[in-house]
Amino acid sequence: MPTLTPPAGSEVIPFASVHTERVEDCLVFPSELSTKVRLGGLVTAVSGGILGAALLSQTSSQGVAVPALLMGLSFVGGLLSTWSPCGYSSLCLLRPVGPYSARSLVKYTPTFLLHGIGYAVGALILGCVLGIAGGLLGFGGVSFGALAGLGAAGIIYGAHQLGFLRVPYPQRRAQVPHDARQRFPVWFIGGLYGLSLGLNYLTYVQTPILYLVTAAAVLSSNIGAAILLFAAFNAGRFLPMAVNYLPVSDITVQNWLARRQEGAALLDGVLLVAGGAALLTFAAL
């Protein structure tokens, strides 16, 4: 047993070792996808985007097909943003307090609802600002130039996500304020985090689909359309919080996300390329 060295003439004091709980190092990491897999995703996305747009053009007008495509892309982009640092943080920090029970879930519900309201307010603010900005800049909604520009951006950023290109992706590299938990009740934190994340540009968002949604909102020059686009994106960001109503531990959720980080990036790239190819096809038709 180790001892503490005493001053001269003093009694030797035994020092018993103390076992402390610790978090084990992560031993399982997502493997990097091969070039063959990423290239296959790129080719499949281009083919699927072109074919999908051609089929849609036979059954519906561009005025219906293009908004539907952008809304779907926005929603899935919101889901994929769960793999951003703040997505991990929110799922971890905004959990029911205490053992899993009906009582803890009831007490958690105001936090969950206020988190969703925060996202809704964020979509409302962003949609109004970007829709008005588009009108002031003179954009006129769906046009050849708008479709071609959005399509090219989708393919370029999709190739970026797939690792074939490196293009600028400026983001504010910040997270929600973790210390707020020490100063405010958890229901207030739920609303605060929802608003911070719902504004999308206050914190880091991993998916470039956010850029496509922003550009589409501005180009629409329509406040209602811009709000709907960000409502879809923010709904995708918010819905994963519902996992906290299930009897699963925080570490289980975090590990599930971590093991699928590369897969999420692959899906992100494939969707961007497919969406871009579809928009370019609509522009050409």
UniProtKB/Swiss-Prot annotation:
Name its pathway.
One-carbon metabolism; methylamine degradation
Q: What transmembrane ranges does the database entry give?
A: 39-59, 63-83, 120-140, 144-164, 184-204, 209-229, 265-285
Q: Which stretch is the leader sequence?
A: none
In what way does this protein cross or attach to the membrane?
A: Multi-pass membrane protein
Q: Primary place of residence?
A: membrane
User: At the top level of its lineage, which domain of life is listed?
Assistant: Bacteria
| Coiled coil spans | none
Gene Ontology cellular component terms for the protein in this record: plasma membrane
Q: Where in the cell is it found?
A: Cell membrane
Q: Does the keyword Transmembrane apply?
A: yes
For the keyword Transport, the answer is: no
Question: Mind listing the UniProt keywords for this protein, alphabetically?
Answer: Cell membrane, Membrane, Transmembrane, Transmembrane helix
Q: What is this protein called?
A: Methylamine utilization protein MauF
The record lists the organism as: Methylorubrum extorquens (strain ATCC 14718 / DSM 1338 / JCM 2805 / NCIMB 9133 / AM1)
